[in-house]
Structure formats: C-alpha cells, structure tokens
Regions:
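Non-catalytic helical/linker scaffolds that mediate oligomerization, partner binding
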Residues: 1-321
Length: 321
C-alpha cells in the first residue's frame, strides 16, 4: 500500500495553506513513509513538522530510522495494541521513549489514557497509574483523544491528567537529570546544554534561560530532563509553539532585542514575576552572540541578586564589537 493516499495529499496541502505546526502521520512503517510527506512539504517550502505515529509492528521494527526522519514520535497505543501482542505495549512504549530522549526528539504517549472518562467523571486507578508511569519514563507529552473529542467530561479529563502529571513530575524532579551521553556530533551547543543541566544538581542552579532562534538549544536542554524549568526566549510565534512539545521548556515569544544583555534581563524579570526564582537563587544563561550570527557558545551562572546589582556587568562583550 502507498504511504500516502490522494486524500492524504489533499489534507497535507490544506495543512500547508493554513500554516499548521504539526502533521501527525498515521501508520508509519519506515523512514520512506516520512520522506513521502517531507518531500511534499519541502516542495512548498513549508516548515510544518512531522510527528510519526507508531501503530504497527513494522513501525516498531524500523523505529530508529523513523525517529531520525521525524521531528517527533507519537506512541499511538490503540491501533498498536491491535497490531502487536498487547502484553508487549508497555515495553515498546518504554523503549521508544528512551530512544527519542537519546536522539533528542519529542515523544508523545497517546490513546486510552483516560478512556473510562469518555462516559464517567472519574478515571480508574489503573489509568492514573498508566499516566504516572509515562511521566516516570520522561515522555515529553501526553495526549487525550476520545476523552476530549467525543467524551462527556472533556474538561474534567484534561484537569485530571494535568493533576496526575504535575504530581508525578515532582517525583521525577527528586531524581535529578538523566545522564544522557553526548552524541557523536561533537556539538558545542550540546556540550554546553548538558553542562547547564548538570549545574542544576552540582551547583544548585534553579532556572536555565536560553534564547533560541531555531529551538535547537532548548531541545538539547530538554533531552537531559532537568529538574528545573528552561525558559526559551523565542524570536517568533512558530518556534514558541513548536517548543511547547519539549520537556520542561517554557517558551516565550519576546520581541527581538539588539543584544544578549537585553534578552537576558527581560527573561530574568519575567521568571521572577512568575515566581520561578528568588533573589538568592542561581540562574544559568545559555546563548550565542546575536550580532555575530553564531550558534550557542557561552554559559554564564550567577545569582539573581548579582544580576540585579547596579555594578553587574554582562560578560557577553563580543555582542558590542
């Protein structure tokens, strides 16, 4: 069977016309299936990102190549449970989540998360545990489907899932960051991102701030699953929306500033106003030199009190040259 039907192509064109952020590609069997969609997007110079839905054995077998070809992965457990032995689903879910973390790609766990809430106002204990276990595996996102599309209690389902996730994440934060090995790309940005995450545990950093033109630095930070928030200052709404899918990232669209110092101070004031950091807390700033057009190339750690000191000098002097 072809990866795309004529109806699929019509729907992709509609997504392009409406400037949709993501396309969820169903029943992906191989990287070639992903490429078939990507070729259409590229032909129209579209920046839409592909989320590949893993729903069959062939997709599971080719998961590494599919992850590489996709922006992110959705573990669609409903159809997957029909295509493969149902007792294998928990192990497949765990393995795919870890593969996505290692490859720094967003991963979504979906289908039958709170299935009983389609008809009932409260979930089963098993459903609560299922959601918590997905959080304990460090998934980037959870997705409801029938519960909100046709269920009797859509708002209650969202509120219930949010409460479970928030509670489970507190346990994750006690465990610290994941010691994910650096990739073989010898990326300076990746090295600095891991250093910033390690600082949350070894130096006591309470918040990481980064400016992100493409979202890449924020995604690097997300892959290490740190215990404290990452504030990503985005230059446009598109990147802000994409980063909503990344673990622990709080994307904020700020108007472009002329230098890193103004970006940094705007972010610090925002985080303090929201109550994420106190005057005595340490914060890390991970960024690149805006005027030089370079990538992420410096990491600075200070207390908030030091930053607000009138004598504080921002160390990124290269942006002024």
């Amino acid at each position: 069977l072809p990866a795309l039907t004529e109806k699929d192509k019509v729907n992709i064109q509609l997504a392009i016309d409406e400037d949709i952020d993501f396309i969820a590609h169903s029943f992906v069997r191989s990287a070639a299936d992903v490429k078939a969609v990507q070729d259409i997007l590229d032909a129209h110079h579209s920046e839409i990102k592909i989320i590949s839905k893993i729903e069959n054995q062939e997709g599971v077998d080719n998961i590494d190549d599919i992850i590489d070809a996709s922006y992110g992965i959705m573990i669609a457990r409903g159809d997957l449970g029909i295509e493969v032995p149902i007792e294998q689903i928990p192990g497949i879910q765990r393995d795919i989540i870890m593969k996505c973390i290692l490859k720094q790609k967003p991963v979504i766990v979906a289908t039958q998360m709170l299935h009983t809430m389609i008809e009932n106002p409260r979930p089963t204990r098993a459903e609560v545990t299922d959601i918590a276990n997905a959080i304990y595996s460090y998934t980037d996102a959870l997705m409801l489907s029938g519960e909100t599309a046709s269920g009797k209690y859509p708002l209650e389902a969202v509120q219930t899932m949010a409460r479970i996730a928030e509670t489970a994440e507190k346990d994750n934060h006690k465990r610290g960051y994941i010691d994910v090995p650096l990739s073989n790309t010898k990326s300076q940005r990746e090295f600095l991102a891991k250093s910033a995450i390690m600082a949350t545990e070894q130096v006591g950093v309470k918040c990481i701030i980064t400016d992100s033109a493409s979202g890449a630095t924020a995604r690097h930070l997300a892959s290490f699953r740190g215990p404290h928030p990452v504030l990503a200052m985005c230059y446009n709404d598109k990147i802000q929306r994409l980063l909503n899918l990344s673990y622990g990232v709080l994307p904020v669209h700020l108007a472009n500033h002329t230098d890193n110092e103004h970006m940094f101070m705007a972010a610090v004031r925002m985080m303090r106003q929201k109550g994420y950091i106190k005057l005595e807390d340490k914060i890390a700033y991970l960024a690149g030199y805006i005027t030089n057009g370079g990538g992420t190339n410096f990491l600075e750690i200070n207390t908030l009190k030091q930053v607000f000191d009138p004598n504080y000098k921002f160390h990124n002097t290269m942006s002024e040259k």
